[in-house]
A protein has these predicted regions:
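Boundary/linker segments flanking structured domains
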Residues: 1-44, 48-126
């Protein structure tokens, strides 16, 4: 069975595409990757935002500019979630389904659980 992100179509990882397709201040999940020569989206990184998916995805542009060979982030996919808990569960599933625990993703650690301490809610964004 092919693993699925359950995120729909991919978009070019540009400021324009991000702004055009993602509503501000939404909780959700995302994946960065590229299309192989058969047009299949190859997942390189999975993540989530508990506060602002649109802003979080823009970090991928900066990563790619830093090291294009390592961060082969040409396109992104995304989906919204209703709660940080829901986004976290999906991130864990995406991480496992796409071999994060086997070193197939750029993610350097298992997904972090949501931080429910309101005073430090920004820490879950890193």
């Amino acid at each position: 069975i092919m693993a699925s992100l359950n995120m729909g179509v991919s978009y070019a990882l540009t400021e324009e595409e991000i702004n055009a397709n993602i509503e501000p201040n939404r909780i959700g999940n995302y994946a960065f990757g590229y299309l192989n020569d058969r047009g299949v989206f190859i997942v390189k990184y999975v993540g989530r935002s508990d506060t602002d998916l649109r802003t979080r995805i823009k970090h991928g542009i900066a990563d790619r500019e830093t090291d294009p060979a390592m961060y082969r982030y040409e396109r992104f996919k995304f989906s919204y979630a209703d709660t940080p808990e829901e986004a976290y569960k999906k991130e864990c599933k995406n991480y496992q389904d796409f071999g994060g625990d086997k070193g197939k993703l750029i993610n350097d650690r298992y997904p972090q659980a949501p931080d429910y301490d309101e005073t430090s809610s920004s820490s879950s964004e890193m």
